Amino acid sequence: MKKIFVSVASYQDPLLLETLCSAYENAEYKENLIFGVCEQSSSGIDLNSIRFQDQIRYELLDPVMAKGPCYARSRIQSFIKDEDYYLQIDSHMIFAKGWDSLLLTYLDWIYEQTNINSIITGYPRSFK
């Protein structure tokens, strides 16, 4: 299976770690995920506490120096290496089981119908 680069820009978001763990735990092919994280926070997440830390490319920026989500996302793009797919998410999300396989299956189906590469976009539901 191909690699998915998951881009996460975060500004002082207490749900960042929960989001990363949800994406990882609910993926069918965990080994194919690479996370690019730009955290704009006064205290970053403890990467040593994350068992998949070797799959995270991480930068911590002082929130005083923050220049918004577009700036953080541009920093994250420098973390991309040879991954096949790019998924940009918010830092406060919960993932469904098998989300990675579902997205790739959907992309393959779109390509079969249209013979062009596509972009899937959406706005996630809120949660409590």
Q: Where do the model's predicted regions map?
A:
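Catalytic cores of eukaryotic secretory-pathway lumenal/extracellular enzymes that build
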Residues: 1-128
